[in-house]
């Protein structure tokens, strides 16, 4: 296992504000371009937002293989009438390693055909044990993070699409990171609006502009509470600053990078307590 793994959180913006265009593959080419950008910057693992690019499994798998990177992509399973909101884990050889469905779809999703998945499982890879908890599963329920922590997860990915209150997203990511002491890669969609067709075929703005503020939190490389106290005293920005272990984007499209030392993560004792158990 490499001593440090570079993770890329891609805060992508849909190329069209028409919901139908996403279903028809309108974002696939842009997703591949963003993957290429992240790989050029040295990323070994790349995560897209929830439901992005939605379709294009063959193209994303081919890009992962060509670039030699792990990818977490929002690729749905099923038909438009009945489908799973799924994050698909793709290996650097282009093979699908796992599919993690959303287990607590919102009422709006259920009304539009989304089926609830069951359970969370860690994905064993040569860059560490990866886990995924999608959007509201992470923000409103503890089942996912707790299940992954019990399985020895090293890095938790939270692909999301916040249709409102995007400015609050970092607080959710930071809170879960502090609670469980694991790196959290929070990847929201870039701020955008989406239009749908109503019953009369007219285009209406279904979701006003919202999103952004992707946030990445990585624990400090310490192995005891005494070392944690010393880290607080000497860290960049001072004791009261989040500088050095919390990164966030604004509303626009962009990529956050985090270098994660998995061995150090496994030694981290948690914040203020000797265990990270809830």
Model-predicted segments: where are they?
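Short, ordered coil/turn segments that flank beta-strands lining enzyme active or ligand-binding pockets
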Residues: 92-93, 126, 219
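Active-site beta-loop-alpha substructure in enzyme catalytic cores
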Residues: 28-31, 35-47, 113-189
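Conserved hydrophobic/aromatic beta-strand scaffold that supports enzyme active sites
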Residues: 9, 87-89, 99, 120-122, ...
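Hydrophobic residues in well-ordered beta-strands that form the structural core
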Residues: 9, 71-73, 132, 186
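Short loop/turn motifs at secondary-structure junctions and domain boundaries
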Residues: 78-82, 113, 205-208
